Swiss-Prot record:
Main location per the UniProt record: cytoplasm
Lineage: Bacteria, Pseudomonadati, Pseudomonadota, Gammaproteobacteria, Pasteurellales
Assigned protein family: Belongs to the bacterial CoaD family.
Keyword Nucleotidyltransferase: yes
This protein's name: Phosphopantetheine adenylyltransferase
Enzyme Commission numbers on file: 2.7.7.3
Swiss-Prot/TrEMBL GO biological process terms: coenzyme A biosynthetic process
Alphabetical keyword list: ATP-binding, Coenzyme A biosynthesis, Cytoplasm, Magnesium, Nucleotide-binding, Nucleotidyltransferase, Transferase
Gene Ontology MF terms in the entry: ATP binding; pantetheine-phosphate adenylyltransferase activity
Organism: Haemophilus influenzae (strain 86-028NP)
Reactions this protein catalyses: (R)-4'-phosphopantetheine + ATP + H(+) = 3'-dephospho-CoA + diphosphate
């Protein structure tokens, strides 16, 4: 079975992330969403909270699995027998950075390629960073994030 992995910090998961997961789930029989610990980023939500929010957000997708990780992505890829890495790219700046990561991951995994998904046009401007900024300044992020995330933000 072809398995792909979509790694990220997902702090929080946005509708842009969800769009990429949903599109991947149509193409591939098994999609793993790997939520990175990333303590250096000073996340708004803990790893456990982020994993749970992603799980709730993808509950309608039967071929999607969600887990947290703290290891090197290349090691996670080897452990799960991954065929490809899914990455979202919004801008040329994203693409340049992701191209470097793709080359590094291909080397470290002995050949696993990265597949780049541009966002749907309506999500091209959305990022977790922007969502956090809007939220921290009292703005409404309801249209930018899945309902479980919006509810979790309201409860904070």
């Amino acid at each position: 079975m072809t398995s792909v992995i979509y790694p990220g910090t997902f702090d929080p998961i946005t509708n842009g992330h969800l769009d990429i997961i949903e599109r991947s789930a149509v193409i591939f029989p098994r999609v793993l969403v790997a939520v990175a610990n990333s303590p250096s980023k000073k996340p708004l939500f803990s790893l456990e909270e982020r994993v749970e929010l992603v799980r709730q957000s993808v509950a309608h997708l039967s071929n999607v699995e969600v887990f947290g990780f703290s290891d090197l992505l290349a090691n996670v890829i080897k452990q799960h027998n991954i065929s490809a890495i899914i990455r979202g790219v919004r801008t040329t700046t994203d693409f340049e950075y992701e191209l470097q990561l793709a080359a590094l991951n291909r080397l470290l995994t002995k050949g696993v390629d990265s597949l780049f998904f541009p966002p749907a046009e309506k999500w091209a401007f959305v990022s977790s960073t922007i969502v956090r900024e809007i939220y921290l300044h009292g703005g409404d992020v309801a249209e930018l994030v899945p309902e479980p995330v919006f509810n979790a933000l309201k409860a904070r």
